Amino acid sequence: MPKIMIQGTASSVGKSIIVAALCRIFKQDGFKVCPYKSQNMSLNSYITLDGREMGRAQVLQAYASGLEPEVYMNPILLKPTTDKNCQVIIRGEVYCNSSAREYYNMKKEFVPMLKKDFEILEDKFDIVVIEGAGSPAEINLRDNDIVNMGLAEMVDSPVILVGDIDKGGVFASLLGTIMLLTEKEKSRVKGTIINKFRGDVDILKPGLSMIEEKIKVPSIGVIPYFRLALEDEDSAVDFNTKISAPIDIAIIKLPHISNFTDMDPLKIEEDVSLRYVTSADDFGNPDLLIIPGSKNTIEDLLYIRKVGIEDKIKKYSSRDGFIFGICGGYQMLGTYIEDPLGVETKVKAVEGMNILDVSTVFAKEKITTRVKGKVCGLTENIDIYGYEIHMGSCNYGKKAKPLVEITDKNGCSCNFKEGAINPGRNVMGTYIHGIFDGAELRQYIMNTLRSRRGIKHKNSKVYENLRDGEIDKLADIVRSSLDMKKVYEILNVKSKFME
């Protein structure tokens, strides 16, 4: 079965977005296509229709392929909990908590599973677009590699190598990567792509010719730098793209921030600018403060307490500042957090910010569920949907009211309260990730902020509807930038480009 693998000279060179683009291009050209990444390390995750957890990058790639996201597209997900430890998720379910060394030693046991899953893909699809991780030149990881050249060898896939010119040193990184590969690995590299180029491509051509001569691998295209309303799964990128926008939304950049893709729908609001708060000095006076999710809630709360950000949040709240906490951010806003079993940290209990009258107790069981419901504590007749990923539960105090009434969990009818809102109705929290994807709640909150500013109300758009158009734009950019005839030759697939 035809397959092609996108590897990179480093992390964040654009592998994920290029895979998404190729998936949409192949779909447009009439092929049944599927994305695949054997192992993803990310704190941005998603819950599938059957309640399993996978990386967000493969979710976008699935949508680009016209598919519903499923865990076989990302069978191994690593979620860092500390600098040296992570939660290992296999086929969407928690497998264990592991140190880096422990996981390195256990990787071989997953090879039969990966082979079996890939064989299923070969039977179901015309083309599989595979994404590598980091760089194949991490020679210290070569022996047990299951995500770069080790995977390419396992499934017999050709490789295209991507370099990022925006950071500088792209030719050195391409050359260095190729030099560190074995001869057998080098033979798999069939082309290179330079990504995020700004300027006149003609100026780049002498460099392209020189690097082709040195590495004996053809360049198949130069992709320009662009901005689209698509999520960036790999890193918490700066949001400062609309500095002069009247509505200022600040996001606390927690050390273990997770699911920061929750904020992506806010980018499409025309009069909104988003920025990260990394210290007390840059807190400012935002129209809305968001405290996002965290993979280590207690440690992150202690951190923002230590650096003075918590004091800023409390003072902001006392001035009727608008605060929205999601998952770990919601827990931080409460009265206290307990971790008696050491689920996230060795700290057994810590006092919260005491802004919302809720308390949290962590438990071993991880909740992963898709939900639908209605807002009940803020206003009426607002539908919401999203997904929950957490290992704790909240108890209400007398001064907190539920924010949401959940009516559906993983396709089953239910009726229970979720989230919280304070009596002043300016501070609220929820466990629901993706709650801003729908237009209704986001529009209500944005128009509340606009009213405070004396700005005319606007209608919000459903993020998913906009996303599909943005994927088409992405495909157009990448199609026009690459030698698609060469791409199809690498795939050994007949298409209109081969005629």
Curated annotation (Swiss-Prot):
InterPro entries: Class_I_gatase-like (IPR029062), CobQ/CobB/MinD/ParA_Nub-bd_dom (IPR002586), CobQ_GATase1 (IPR033949), CobQ_N (IPR047045), CobQ_synth (IPR004459), GATase_3 (IPR011698), P-loop_NTPase (IPR027417)
Metabolic or biological pathway: Cofactor biosynthesis; adenosylcobalamin biosynthesis
A Pfam family annotated for this UniProt entry: GATase_3
GO molecular function, one term: ABC-type vitamin B12 transporter activity
Disulfide bond sites: none
Alphabetical list of SUPFAM superfamilies matching this protein: Class I glutamine amidotransferase-like (SSF52317), P-loop containing nucleoside triphosphate hydrolases (SSF52540)
Gene3D superfamilies from the UniProt entry: 3.40.50.880, P-loop containing nucleotide triphosphate hydrolases
Limits of the GATase cobBQ-type domain: 246-441
Catalytic residue positions: 327, 433
GO biological process terms on file: cobalamin biosynthetic process
Keyword set, alphabetical order: Cobalamin biosynthesis, Glutamine amidotransferase
Family, similarity comment: Belongs to the CobB/CobQ family. CobQ subfamily.
Function, as annotated: Catalyzes amidations at positions B, D, E, and G on adenosylcobyrinic A,C-diamide. NH(2) groups are provided by glutamine, and one molecule of ATP is hydrogenolyzed for each amidation.
Protein name (Swiss-Prot/TrEMBL): Cobyric acid synthase
Organism: Clostridium kluyveri (strain ATCC 8527 / DSM 555 / NBRC 12016 / NCIMB 10680 / K1)
Gene name, Swiss-Prot/TrEMBL: cobQ
